[in-house]
Amino acid sequence: MSGGDGESSYAANSRLQEKAILKSRPQLHDAVEAAHALLLPSGSGKGTTMVVADLGCSSGPNTLLVVSEVLGAFASRCEKKPVHVQFFLNDLPSNDFNLVFRSLELFTKGKGATWPPYYIAGLPGSFYARLFPDRSVHLFYSYCLMIRSKVPADLVSGAILNQGNIYIWETTPPSVVKLYQEQFLEDMSLFLKLRHTELVASGQMVLTFLGRKNSDVLRGEMSWI
């Protein structure tokens, strides 16, 4: 999908992503509360800034929906310990960050009166690489770990091995399924290793996946969250 906010844009075709964010709200609010508990009390002489990163933030209303949910969790659960919240919105450099930044003014005008002070920055780059200094992030959120870091090497030969499909389906050869499963294991292991280095001790992650309800990887709609 394209950038901007036109008919074919991601912003206009992301209802499933919105559903995933709202469905994971209880887990996200729990994670915010747990991460908030890690912060030093005000008056300790040290900073009370919580760092939150949305990995694969996209562009459009869902990007700021995650921000809104995090801030809403502070308003409802974390009133006793004052805090500032630093958000990093991460996606590939090709993401339409300009659309995100243009929507910030309207978002700020509609903010909740009980939200803590917050700051939003864009962070272009792949989440399959280092993004933050050691032990610097309190909470990671991502909906995008279904996306692989690359096409498996054995599928780059030019031969069409998954003809007629844009993802794994009933007619996908078992050899192709195996290659993507191996790529997932490689990517997920790398992702967890990187985030482990970047998370503060006892930091939190909320990772939402889209898959199939059926245990058969070749059958069923790709809409199970």
Residue ranges and their predicted role:
Residues 1-135, 148-172, 207, 212:
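N-terminal charged/capping segments associated with class I S-adenosyl-L-methionine
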Residues 24, 66, 184-191:
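Alpha-helical packing segments of well-folded alpha/beta enzyme cores
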Residues 135, 187-194, 198:
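Short, conserved SAM-binding segment of the class I
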Residues 139:
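Short, Asp-centered acidic motifs that coordinate Mg2+ and/or phosphate
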Residues 142-187, 199, 213-225:
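Mobile active-site "lid"/loop adjacent to the S-adenosyl-L-methionine
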Residues 199-205:
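Short glycine-dipeptide loop
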